[in-house]
């Protein structure tokens, strides 16, 4: 249960445009990725895995500053630093001017970032290139999580691939 202040309504396009302006390399996972792969469901946040190199983390820090990103459960704290983003096993959920953003680092079931990105589906969202975790990687992450919502996503995603009878 969140104890922080309510976040702005999710505006995925605005979040992604900010990351794009700062040339942040990332791959989208979570609910948005599930939607792109054909399962229509709601989500209240954007989940991304950033490329882990130092230069990319620096660009991500600048994008988070522009977004006024703050830890959801520590509203008095400032945006994460490059050191926190590079070394923290878990980055707390962030509130931003455009909704909640989850910057994920060590995601159970996820391959190394280079492999995740190489297998990503790249789509165009109103002129923004968007790397979405490939369906097999997405299912592996959801299976490793084991949460009820993730298991429902797996069932829906695998049903999408099944021919109708």
Name each model feature, range by range:
Residues 1-165:
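Compositionally biased terminal segments of proteins
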């Amino acid at each position: 249960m969140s104890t922080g202040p309510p976040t702005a309504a999710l505006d995925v396009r605005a979040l992604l445009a900010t990351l794009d302006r700062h040339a942040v390399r990332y791959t989208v996972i979570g609910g948005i990725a599930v939607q792109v792969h054909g399962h229509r469901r709601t989500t209240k946040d954007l989940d991304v895995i950033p490329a882990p190199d130092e230069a990319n983390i620096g660009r991500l820090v600048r994008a988070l500053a522009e977004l006024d990103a703050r830890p959801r459960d520590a509203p008095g704290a400032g945006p994460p630093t490059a050191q926190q983003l590079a070394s923290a096993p878990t980055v707390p959920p962030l509130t931003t001017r455009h909704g909640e953003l989850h910057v994920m680092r060590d995601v159970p079931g996820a391959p190394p970032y280079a492999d995740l990105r190489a297998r990503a589906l790249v789509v165009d969202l109103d002129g923004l290139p968007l790397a979405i975790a490939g369906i097999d990687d997405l299912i592996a992450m959801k299976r490793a999580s084991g949460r009820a919502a993730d298991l429902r996503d797996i069932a829906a995603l695998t049903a999408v691939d099944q021919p109708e009878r």
